[in-house]
Amino acid sequence: MSSAATKPVKRSGIIKGFNKGHAVAKRTVTSTFKKQVVTKRVAAIRDVIREISGFSPYERRVSELLKSGLDKRALKVAKKRLGSIQAGKKKRDDIANINRKASAK
């Protein structure tokens, strides 16, 4: 098997040979979707939804555990409900920030 068949080569525009085919410029695909970016609009909408709907039962339990200083237990509860340790840590930090803001008022 030749190396020309395994890796792509630049087309020459010639009808025969290894480099046969129409010569085109390779496009670079740019991603427009950013997973972690939250816009002002989305943040405002989420705040309104949170204000209307409140917290889910597991979030209330995590909040109570954090208030009593049981961070590790709160992480375990969040991990069990959300499925991954990373999601659990993020949720624990979010609820801790909400508790901090509520106590500052």
Curated annotation (Swiss-Prot):
Coiled-coil features, chain-numbered ranges: none
InterPro entries, per database record: Ribosomal_eL36, Ribosomal_eL36_sf
Any single Gene Ontology cellular-component annotation: cytosolic large ribosomal subunit
Annotated segments matching region Disordered: 86-105
GO MF annotations, alphabetized: RNA binding; structural constituent of ribosome
Example GO BP: cytoplasmic translation
First and last residue of the signal peptide: none
UniProt keywords, alphabetically: Ribonucleoprotein, Ribosomal protein
Keyword Transmembrane helix assigned: no
Keyword RNA-binding among record annotations: no
Pfam families assigned: Ribosomal_L36e (PF01158)
Family: Belongs to the eukaryotic ribosomal protein eL36 family.
Name the UniProt record assigns to this protein: Large ribosomal subunit protein eL36
Species annotation: Dictyostelium discoideum (Social amoeba)
